[in-house]
Amino acid sequence: METISRQNKPQQQLIGAHMSAAGGVHKAVERAEAAGATALQVFTRNQRQWNAPPLEEHDAELFTAAVRRWGGYPVSSHASYLINPAADTPEGAERSVALMADELQRAGRLGIEMVVVHPGAHKGQGEAAGAALAAARLDEALERCGSPAVMVLLENTAGQGTMLGASFAGLAAVIEASRMPERYGICLDTAHAFGAGYDLRDAALYDAAIRELDVCAGLDRLRLVHANDSLTGLGSRRDRHTHIGQGELGEAAFRLLMRDERLHHVPKVLETPKGKGPEEDMMNMAVLRRLACP
């Protein structure tokens, strides 16, 4: 399946949300369009189960047609939370590789270019060993999937337990250990970064964080931002999202993010609390757009 992209890149920033695929993955596109989003993240299968029905060709056709009608805005998928690329057992490793390969294959069939995944937990093996294992397993999934246009986006974490990727150097370590680093990018989650100790509220500290990301991995690898406020404090090592401007990060951090010309082209996707309708997403997107204006 060919990837879908916009012919004319918009001048405004691309802002969207993770949308439900209830009723069919194409419904997520319809929900994004109805909310006024210009970026989208989806689950292409049940994210909390190891096994899922195969993606039917009809469903793939409905999805790609919906994306074209919407305008070809960027779409990413988020891989299952069950995947642990740094698993410390052969069984856990094989299950994670097989599931990640399925995620990548589904994305390829849907024309989705980016699959976000957490780098995993090293379970006491140490960060260096965990990074090497994560790279080897993700490389294997990329080889199995048969979708050469799809990129793995490693998402930074809040550093809970033995989770890898709390630091930008930790994300870079996985990429450096890969045999195919050109297939990897980075997804920056603002709430996770804050939980891991990156203070994004102060201009100087925010700039230092982005410069650190650039030095460690290169800003050219940053393909997606998860714009989430945090219910928990700086360095809490906890992952709790809330509405933009209503958490510990506050509007100051997102004003810096939205006015950072280095990241102007990077899609910003919300993973904030939802209600029964699109109102919460529309509210949060409106806040981001407002903060982008000088």
From Swiss-Prot:
Zn(2+) 2 binds at residues 155, 189, 226, 271. GO terms for molecular function: deoxyribonuclease IV (phage-T4-induced) activity; DNA binding; DNA-(apurinic or apyrimidinic site) endonuclease activity; phosphoric diester hydrolase activity; zinc ion binding. Zn(2+) 1 binds at residues 78, 118, 155. Binds 3 Zn(2+) ions. Keywords: DNA damage, DNA repair, Endonuclease, Hydrolase, Metal-binding, Nuclease, Zinc. Its cofactor is Zn(2+). SUPFAM superfamilies: Xylose isomerase-like. InterPro entries: AP_endonuc_2, AP_endonuc_F2_Zn_BS, Xyl_isomerase-like_sf, Xyl_isomerase-like_TIM-brl. Zn(2+) 3 binds at residues 192, 239, 241. It is an enzyme of class 3 (hydrolase). GO terms for biological process: base-excision repair. It catalyses: Endonucleolytic cleavage to 5'-phosphooligonucleotide end-products. PROSITE patterns: AP_NUCLEASE_F2_1, AP_NUCLEASE_F2_3, AP_NUCLEASE_F2_4. Its EC number is 3.1.21.2. It holds the Pfam family AP_endonuc_2. It comes from the Bacteria. Belongs to the AP endonuclease 2 family. Endonuclease IV plays a role in DNA repair. It cleaves phosphodiester bonds at apurinic or apyrimidinic (AP) sites, generating a 3'-hydroxyl group and a 5'-terminal sugar phosphate. This is Probable endonuclease 4. It comes from Oleidesulfovibrio alaskensis (strain ATCC BAA-1058 / DSM 17464 / G20).
